[in-house]
Amino acid sequence: MPKMKTNKGAAKRFKKTAGGIKYKHATKRHILTKRTTKNKRQLRPNAILPRCEVAAVIRMLPYA
């Protein structure tokens, strides 16, 4: 059986850890002047993917 292909876009965005799948929050790149300090602070830490989306990401990352 041939090797399964990794979805390269997903590989750059998600990282599998013991606690789940880690990802970075969106809307934190540019044009941040209109965002409040509180909002920018809340987007700062990495987040764990919700359980309902884990299966789709695992399918894209067969060797993670």
Swiss-Prot record:
Does the record's keyword annotation contain Flavoprotein?
A: no
Q: Which residues cross the membrane?
A: none
UniProt-listed SUPFAM superfamilies = L35p-like
Keyword Ribonucleoprotein appears in the UniProt entry = yes
Q: Which GO terms label this protein's molecular function in UniProt?
A: structural constituent of ribosome
Q: Which cysteines are joined by disulfide bonds?
A: none
Question: Could you tell me the keywords of this UniProt record?
Answer: Ribonucleoprotein, Ribosomal protein
Which InterPro entries does the entry mention? Ribosomal_bL35, Ribosomal_bL35-like, Ribosomal_bL35_CS, Ribosomal_bL35_sf
Q: Which GO terms describe its cellular component?
A: cytosolic large ribosomal subunit
**Which biological process, per GO, is one annotated for this protein?**
translation
What NCBIfam families does UniProt report for this protein, alphabetically? Answer: rpmI_bact
Q: Which HAMAP family match?
A: Ribosomal_bL35
Similarity remark: Belongs to the bacterial ribosomal protein bL35 family.
- For this entry, the protein name equals Large ribosomal subunit protein bL35
What is the native source organism of this protein? Vibrio parahaemolyticus serotype O3:K6 (strain RIMD 2210633)
Q: What is the lineage of its organism?
A: Bacteria, Pseudomonadati, Pseudomonadota, Gammaproteobacteria, Vibrionales
